[in-house]
């Protein structure tokens, strides 16, 4: 009995070792789970469900195989793949979730999210996020030819990398008050998220009780998952 959480794989054809590691994860660890939750940034970039990138089809088939085996897969959008839509969800068998979701996991109420909305000290990013999450902006972008979308996405990634290089690490991490506010809004003592690439289990106080924030790591040289069982919540790093 276990529910698994992963995030920030940033899958791309230029990183075949990470792709292979994810395929092994789907075929082995995930097959033993009650459910798999992917908390955003499964892909390095997503410019629309109509992008014929072979990697996308390969991942859809692999995830669908997991779902068809009896393990449901749920997905929360990240800041890199927020344009994943109903078509890819249908092809992969994934269930799309809202950006914040409370789960009842073996008697624990657990809030899950990608985590970028917690980084409220980074005002520049939050302003950018508000723009690209505007439904009208997204609809307009998706009407553009694929080659133009690719150019825009590449330019945005380059701009993001340049901007982040000049920001302090503290600004790009979560805001502690925002974390507590979210946990108290949802009346939970557990929060699982990704985005910051800083795997850790943090103890804090929320709702006048001890609380825990579990941060998933990015998949670079190793994989990262959170395994929730009736008895434990465990952050696990594993070789790819």
From Swiss-Prot:
The gene is lpxH. It is a peripheral membrane protein. Its EC number is 3.6.1.54. Pathway: Glycolipid biosynthesis; lipid IV(A) biosynthesis; lipid IV(A) from (3R)-3-hydroxytetradecanoyl-[acyl-carrier-protein] and UDP-N-acetyl-alpha-D-glucosamine: step 4/6. It is found in: Cell inner membrane. GO terms for cellular component: cytoplasm; extrinsic component of plasma membrane. Keywords: Cell inner membrane, Cell membrane, Hydrolase, Lipid A biosynthesis, Lipid biosynthesis, Lipid metabolism, Manganese, Membrane, Metal-binding. This is UDP-2,3-diacylglucosamine hydrolase. GO terms for molecular function: manganese ion binding; UDP-2,3-diacylglucosamine hydrolase activity. CDD domains: MPP_YbbF-LpxH. Hydrolyzes the pyrophosphate bond of UDP-2,3-diacylglucosamine to yield 2,3-diacylglucosamine 1-phosphate (lipid X) and UMP by catalyzing the attack of water at the alpha-P atom. Involved in the biosynthesis of lipid A, a phosphorylated glycolipid that anchors the lipopolysaccharide to the outer membrane of the cell. Coiled coil: none annotated. Its cofactor is Mn(2+). The lineage of its organism: Bacteria, Pseudomonadati, Pseudomonadota, Gammaproteobacteria, Enterobacterales. Its main location: membrane. Belongs to the LpxH family. Binds 2 Mn(2+) ions per subunit in a binuclear metal center. The keyword Nucleus does not apply. Mn(2+) 1 binds at residues 8, 10, 41, 197. PANTHER family: UDP-2,3-DIACYLGLUCOSAMINE HYDROLASE (PTHR34990:SF1), UDP-2,3-DIACYLGLUCOSAMINE HYDROLASE-RELATED (PTHR34990). InterPro entries: Calcineurin-like_PHP_ApaH, LpxH-like, Metallo-depent_PP-like, UDP-diacylglucosamine_Hdrlase. GO terms for biological process: lipid A biosynthetic process. It catalyses: UDP-2-N,3-O-bis[(3R)-3-hydroxytetradecanoyl]-alpha-D-glucosamine + H2O = 2-N,3-O-bis[(3R)-3-hydroxytetradecanoyl]-alpha-D-glucosaminyl 1-phosphate + UMP + 2 H(+). Mn(2+) 2 binds at residues 41, 79, 114, 195. Substrate binds at residues 79-80, 122, 160, 164, 167, 195.
């Amino acid at each position: 009995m276990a529910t698994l959480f992963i995030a920030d794989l940033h899958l791309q054809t230029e990183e075949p070792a990470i792709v292979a590691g994810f395929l092994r994860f789907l075929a082995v660890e995930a097959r033993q789970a009650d459910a798999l939750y992917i908390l955003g940034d499964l892909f390095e970039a997503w410019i629309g469900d109509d992008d014929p990138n072979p990697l996308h089809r390969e991942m859809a088939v692999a995830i669908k195989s997991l779902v068809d085996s009896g393990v449901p897969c749920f997905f929360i959008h990240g800041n890199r793949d927020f344009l994943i839509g109903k078509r890819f969800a249908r092809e992969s068998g994934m269930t799309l979730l809202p950006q914040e979701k409370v789960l009842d996991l073996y008697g624990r109420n657990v809030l899950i999210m990608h985590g970028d909305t917690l980084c409220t000290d980074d005002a520049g990013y939050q302003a950018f996020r508000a723009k690209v999450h505007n439904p009208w902006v997204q609809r307009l972008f998706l009407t553009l030819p694929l080659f133009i979308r690719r150019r825009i996405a590449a330019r945005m990634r380059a701009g993001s990398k340049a901007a982040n290089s000049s920001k302090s690490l503290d600004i790009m991490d979560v805001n502690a008050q925002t974390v507590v506010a979210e946990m108290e809004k949802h009346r939970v003592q557990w929060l699982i998220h990704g985005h910051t690439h800083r795997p850790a289990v943090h103890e804090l106080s929320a709702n006048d009780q001890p609380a825990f924030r579990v941060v998933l790591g990015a998949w670079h040289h190793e994989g990262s998952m959170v395994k929730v069982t009736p008895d434990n919540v465990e952050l696990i790093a594993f070789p790819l």
